[in-house]
Regions:
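Alpha-helical transmembrane segments of multi-pass membrane proteins predominantly involved
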Residues: 1-221
Length: 221
């Protein structure tokens, strides 16, 4: 029974890494948002399973928060924002998809090696979940670095935060009060980012980070 419990936990955490790799492959905003919704859904299942095996009821609330806000509310709101702003739906990348995917594979390998070596005495389930969580975190950071569009960078940041939640729940769980504060912080940040994007669109007629950098450079001359 314990073996099956560990296998399911590893399957869900590994699936989260796989969906993070899928995010790197996307070149359209709508597809990226759909994959992020799937990312958050897998996180929900992983946290709910951790709640079951740890007998930690507060983690069910964490899973519900992830499902409601990250898998439903935020992706739907970003879809509407893209339509209202008329944002260019193709994602411009700093490098090609191929090199980005190779970099992602390298980061996953690095996360596995580092985490398994620095936590030799940890609980096996927690140890491997932390390795998966670090992989998700690094892949989210890679999404932020390799995308020029501000919306895709926001999605990368939120996927990075999913990795942090996976790490917290996989270790010993996260106190409910902390998770609620994190959820509200993310919601507030999302509202601020939405207003910020509207203002950028009104002022510069684009949300492309490269175009904003070019404008900043011209102002300095």
């Amino acid at each position: 029974m314990n073996g099956l419990v560990f296998d399911i936990a590893h399957l869900l955490a590994g699936s989260l890494v796989l969906v993070s790799m899928m995010m790197l492959y996307q070149d359209r905003l709508y597809a990226l948002l759909n994959v992020f919704a799937l990312h958050s859904l897998v996180l929900t299942l992983s946290v709910a399973w951790q709640a079951f095996i740890q007998d930690a009821p507060h983690l069910y609330v964490t899973a519900a928060i992830a499902l409601l806000f990250k898998a439903i509310v935020i992706p739907v709101a970003l879809h509407r924002m893209i339509r209202q702003l008329g944002i260019h739906r193709e994602i411009e990348t700093v490098v090609g998809i191929g090199p980005t995917m190779l970099a992602g594979i390298g980061l996953v390998a690095l996360a596995m090696v580092v985490m398994l070596r620095v936590t030799p005495d940890a609980n096996p389930l927690a140890r491997e979940d932390l390795a998966f969580a670090l992989s998700v975190l690094l892949l989210g950071l890679l999404v932020m670095i390799t995308r020029r569009n501000a919306v895709s960078q926001v999605v990368g940041f939120m996927s990075l935060e999913n990795g942090l939640v996976l790490a917290a729940t996989g270790a010993r769980g996260m106190p409910l009060v902390v998770e609620i504060s994190v959820a509200f912080s993310i919601l507030i940040a999302f509202i601020v980012i939405g207003v910020f994007l509207f203002r950028i669109r009104e002022r510069f007629d684009t949300v492309d980070v490269r175009a904003l950098d070019d404008f900043k450079g011209r102002r300095r001359k």
